């Protein structure tokens, strides 16, 4: 635990000033002249971007049908010490709105979007900045971009899809940008427009992170919302499974980090990596000798010390290169395994066990009073219309 706390302190001391500097430069508009490092959050319309950002920030962002994010939203999260009070601020153009409670965020952002893009369904490339300072958020800055839509609806401009894609592309095509692509788990990932755009500007996937947003609770609410008892019980079970799966995945990831502390000196892969590094180092030394022969001759007077230091450096490089490669492969695989496979299987098994309890089936399927009344009304209407049809049929005869 002490090592984790030391790492966090080191991060806050070294990384936080860099994030603050980038945020300051972006606020000054330097991004028009220079590409600044950024994490851009993209996704198809209603892909679950808001849920991801709300989980990180702890505040409610604008939601609804259609295009909700109509301006790029720079979400600046700053971690405070335990006991310090939550603070927030929304900035756009020359306007700054101080916030004292998380519940004020949604309305403030909506006002900012209406001010910049107008009241309606248009979009703008002007930034809205949301600063959130809290003990419960990470030190992080994200840029939330409008959700991708294919077809204009209602009063939307006919070329709204093209406008959004053009806006997104201005961010994700920069080499300094990491693209966080949010994909709902209940669709074919290969067909998502956001992922296609990310692959187009980053074919190797070096700057792209895919985040699969589970939709179990959403599907439950949409399809079984009338059965309140079933919904409440199922949501409780889903939350319990999610927490257990998170704990199991975390333990497995920690185990992989512990395993990487072991140096496999006899491992063929490690030996190959070490060989490659040695060849590169030798090539560098040859180049240095050609450029500056005098320096090379002076260094050769201390062969033993130089060789020992060089060997240690080469082993360290080989070890960390293999660690990075192994962790880069295994950690995403573990996360995908738990999200896409075991989580769904556990929910399916739990729901089947739930419905096998015959003593509670009638309680689970008990409808809300307004649903029962609606059904009675529809039945009476159906009877009236059926009688009217029969009378009309007799009249025509």
UniProtKB/Swiss-Prot annotation:
PROSITE patterns: G_DYNAMIN_1 (PS00410), G_DYNAMIN_2 (PS51718), GED (PS51388). Transmembrane segments: none annotated. One of its GO terms (molecular function) is GTPase activity. It holds the Pfam family Dynamin_M. GO terms for cellular component: nucleus. GO terms for biological process: innate immune response; response to virus. Signal peptide: none annotated. Belongs to the TRAFAC class dynamin-like GTPase superfamily. Dynamin/Fzo/YdjA family. This is Protein Mx1.
């Amino acid at each position: 635990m002490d090592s984790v706390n030391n790492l966090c302190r080191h991060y806050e001391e070294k990384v936080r000033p860099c994030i603050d500097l980038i945020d300051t430069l972006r606020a000054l508009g330097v991004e028009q002249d220079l590409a600044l490092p950024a994490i851009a959050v993209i996704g198809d319309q209603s892909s679950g971007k808001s849920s991801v950002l709300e989980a990180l920030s702890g505040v409610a962002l604008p939601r609804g049908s259609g295009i909700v994010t109509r301006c790029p939203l720079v979400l600046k999260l700053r971690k405070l010490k335990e006991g310090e009070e939550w603070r927030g601020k929304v900035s756009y153009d020359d306007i700054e709105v101080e916030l004292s409670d998380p519940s004020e965020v949604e309305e403030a952002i909506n006002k900012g979007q209406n001010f910049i893009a107008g009241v309606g369904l248009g979009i703008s490339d002007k930034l809205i900045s949301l600063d959130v300072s809290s003990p419960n958020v990470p030190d992080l800055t994200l840029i939330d971009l409008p959700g991708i839509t294919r077809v204009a609806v209602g009063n939307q401009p006919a070329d709204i899809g093209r406008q959004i894609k053009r806006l997104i592309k201005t961010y994700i095509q920069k080499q300094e940008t990491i693209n966080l692509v949010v994909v709902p788990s209940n669709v074919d990932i290969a067909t998502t427009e956001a992922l296609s755009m990310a692959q187009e500007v980053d074919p190797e996937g070096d700057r792209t992170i895919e985040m699969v947003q589970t939709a179990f609770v959403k599907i439950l609410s949409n399809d079984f919302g009338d059965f309140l008892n079933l919904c409440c019980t199922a949501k409780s079970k889903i939350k319990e499974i999610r927490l257990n799966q998170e704990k199991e995945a975390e333990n497995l990831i920690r185990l992989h980090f512990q395993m990487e502390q072991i140096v496999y000196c006899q491992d063929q892969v490690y030996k190959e990596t070490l060989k490659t590094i040695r060849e590169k180092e030798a090539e560098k030394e040859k180049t240095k000798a050609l450029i500056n022969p005098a320096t090379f001759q002076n260094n050769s007077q201390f062969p033993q010390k130089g060789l020992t230091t060089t060997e240690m450096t080469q082993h360290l490089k080989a070890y960390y290169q293999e660690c990075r490669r192994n962790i880069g492969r295994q950690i995403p695989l573990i996360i995908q395994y738990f999200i896409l496979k075991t989580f769904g299987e556990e929910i399916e098994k739990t729901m089947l066990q739930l419905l096998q309890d015959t003593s509670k089936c009638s309680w689970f399927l008990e409808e809300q009073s307004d649903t029962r009344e609606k059904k009675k009304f529809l039945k009476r209407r159906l009877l009236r219309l059926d009688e009217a049809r029969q009378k009309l049929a007799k009249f025509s005869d």
